[in-house]
Amino acid sequence: MVNHIVMWNFKEVIKEEDKAGLKAAMEENLKALVGKVPGLLTVEFVASPITSSTHDIALVTTLETAEDIAIYAKHPEHVKVADTYVRPYVKDRACLDY
């Protein structure tokens, strides 16, 4: 099993009052990928980090193998969710796989 962690910050143009709705949509759609993407076992979405954090939101996933990370990254369902609910609103992506 491997973990794939991705963290982002919201773009400056995103209004504070819009962030809760965006976080909810991200979480719902990212969690819905379990069962659709081969090798993707679990999805946790961190929407409320403590104030010492350097990023606004995080995605913590567990996959069966390291090779499944590449499958996940290119899977059409993941790309659709990322392009619709995540990428338009975020910047400063950081990733750690282990």
Residue ranges and their predicted role:
Residues M1-D56, E64-K74, Y98:
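Short S/T/G/P-rich N-terminal loop/turn motif that feeds into the first structured element of a domain
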Residues L63-A94:
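C-terminal structural segments of small proteins and small subunits
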